[in-house]
Amino acid sequence: MFNFKILFRTFLVLLFIIPCTALPQSLSKVHFSTLYGLRTDSLTLSDNTALSIKREKPVLSFRLDEKMLSAGDAELRDMADGYVLQFGNSVHLKVNQPSDDSQGWQCDVEFENISADTVTISNVLPFGADSASVSISGMGPDNPARAWLSRPGYSPLRVILPDNSWELGYSSFDVQNGISVCAISRRMGTVGGIERRYETLLPPKAKVSYRIYAGIFRGDWQNGLKLMFRDRYLYDISEFDNTLYQRSDLAWIRESYLIVLQMAWDREFFDRQAGKYTFSDLLRKGIDQFGHIDAYGIWPTWPRLGLDQRNQWDLYRDLPGGIRQLRIFGGLARQNNTRLFISGNPWDVSAKPDDYMKEIAELIAEADADGVFLDIRNSSCRQLQSAADSVRSGVLMYSEGMAVPADMPGIISGRVHNDIFLSPELNLNKLIKPDFSIFRVCDVGEDILHREIAISFFNGYGTELNLFRPGGRDENYQKDLDYLAATTFILRQNNDAFLDMDWTPLIGTLADRIYVNRWRAGEKTIFTVLNLRPEGFDGKLFRIEGNIARHYVSLWNHENIIPVTEGGMTWLTANTEGWLASASGTRKEGSVDCIAEFPLLLGSKLKGDSLLLRSAGDNRVLVWKGNPSNSGVFKEFRLGRDTIISLKQLFGYYQGKIVVQLLNGKNLLDENIHYFRGGKPWMVSSVERTVRATGIAPDMLLIPGTEFTYELSAEEDFIPYPELSGLTTSVDSFLIDKYPVTNARYYEFLQSTGYRPVDTTRYLKHWKYDIYPQGQENYPVVYLSLEDMKAYARWAGKRLPTEAEWQLAAQGTDGRKWPWGNEFHGTMCNNAFGKLTPVNAFSKGMSPYEVVDLVGNVWQMTNDMYFNGSYYFMIIRGGSFYNPESGRMYIKGGPQPLDKTQMMLMVSQGYDRNATVGFRCVKDIESSYFRGKR
């Protein structure tokens, strides 16, 4: 039968997971206005829809030497094949007639130097930039990363562009009806000019040409970036071959976030003084700190190559123990979830360039290597991957640089090079191909790594610990490793989100210089937060759609986040650390947060030290002692049904944070955070059910089961009591002793069993020669420990009553204050006589169920033991014959009303035995035998 609900749900899922930034229409024409220079005033879409631009925009703007110029301010001449604009006596700009393209509108422009001096052309920006547009252009000193992204309402931030797109210009702006335009400019070539990263030098008569590509999109400004970078690959490539990305044997790199590269002469790899390898120690440290190292590369070549005639392959084979030892290391590494990399140095001409593919394949085979670090390469090639594949599957190519979009089909991993000292905040390579595995090079010997680790985490990719340069392994390095361990842990647990093909950079925030990226995986959303404000940040940060079926957690701090609703809008807060202002602009700056939006899957609850875990099906449940980490303490459960566990049994006497995580394999699905704090007590006892009675013994009475409500209070609350007010409980029917256990009855137990406690201190202190005083056979037995009482109860086939059972037996369901009614009568009980009385001395003081001697003679032990993180105590009820009157600090004695409860602090069996505490027992029943009985 057709199920419309399932179809609709499937449509919604596809709507959210399939990237969709472009519109059904495309941009067909951009119309020019020539009244003031060359400007754009309207658009025509592929379906002939005409759209006017609210405010005319120049066709482009650019920087001539140090001055920004606009096509809207130039002298214009019409040509048969386009337009020529002249900027003083310096430059001619030729704008060719636009051409149609299936992927939007494009236009070629050419700058020509008409002066007698060399000029510099840079920052060619399609449609210019204003306060309402989003743009990318070069800014600041000439260095490897000087591209800046400008957004309305925020200060610019730096971005990383592909290595062949440093000169790229980008802009986007709203048009009308929810439609926006986005455009890029790409340098196509020069005639007589000199190309530099971000600019072109034009001697006299030299030329440089650019191509402008434009398209339309709907929605947030980020969709324009997605269209140009992710969907159209900056027009570097028309179709993307995903063959390598779809290979299951290479999928491991997409779950990898930590690579270590080390030279063969490093003492952490081989200790020359001891003459032995220390590689196993390195792996062990990696496990302790990071769970594991994803990949480890050993480098025995540069800068040793050239000292003698040996080539790069010889240096591998001449390592101590030879290639056989390296192969052993490969196996050892894989046993510890680490892949072993070798390196390839194509510049090593001594290695016979013609045999390079053959030699590298042979070394992969001999070393059983899992990957190859491609020195001085930004890309790989099919021949190289094929050479590796001919040996074994799963061998990865890892380039020194980052592949440009056209080369990405041939390699699936690369690096943010340490040529860039301070990494830009946003890496747009991650937007181009979200499943391309990126690793930021952190040169340990160069400087501290903190800032670079933070930015890698913000961008959802990994880190390469590069140990080539000596030095840097000091106390700051250990701090960096701890920081890296924390980011790596979150990246791994949320790998599914960080592969989101439709992730969104830089969602709107209430504060500047604190940035948020959004990542989704199924019903989970991850927000990575990067703070570059030295004072730190704590407060409302970004808007969400309020949803009562979701909850929010900081995965960085492992704290619950309560959304803030104001003016009909809902906001999430963030908390990031600050730093000394003097550290800004250095690698000491930067702090992060990571906020998760989860569906309500776990639903775990903490009551006392009892943790309720819901059924998790095939998923894993991890219960953490404190914050989750690679070195943290946790217990794993696979639960087919709801389960209650004791935290004391898991973690001993621990107070603090408890984090519960639900994982599907390695990926986090939900997280609950609880705080297990001492002070407020929780019950640690359980009821050990007896054999169910089918009849009523002469010395017992039936208490019918019921649900009832009662109120309790305590005289002193310095040590907190359990919850006392408005207690509603359901009690099953049971039998209770009519009287407290007497000396005679306890003596019978001793004669029958020969029971003797391990600790005999104060045991039956009032007895002489192992028998009670003459004439006191019917007095309540005292000077017993909890263990003594339970031993008797087991012998009798009974147990101690819970406090609720004692309450019901004493009070009934009418809430009376005393067993006999609401008024106190001194003749109904032992009224603080200062000595014990027989248990049947006050039969008129019975309860509604005819239970006798409930108050005034001895405090009566219940089964309820509590723990507050520091102390154990039992609940006793009813008061006793002893009532100290000389000071208000004493426990109040004498008969106690039924709304008063009292704790008895526990130390040891001997210490706990006293003259005022006795007990009575109860027995479970088979209810079917007692229907209608009272």
Q: What is each PLM-predicted segment?
A:
Residues 40-278, 283-295, 476, 480-490:
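Carbohydrate-recognition beta-sandwich/jelly-roll modules
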Residues 566-598:
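C-terminal beta-strand-rich structural cap/linker in extracellular carbohydrate-active enzymes
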Residues 689-766, 784-787, 856:
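A short glycine-rich, aromatic-capped structural motif
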Residues 703, 756, 761-903, 910-915, ...:
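Functional-site microenvironments in short loops/helix caps that host divalent-cation chemistry
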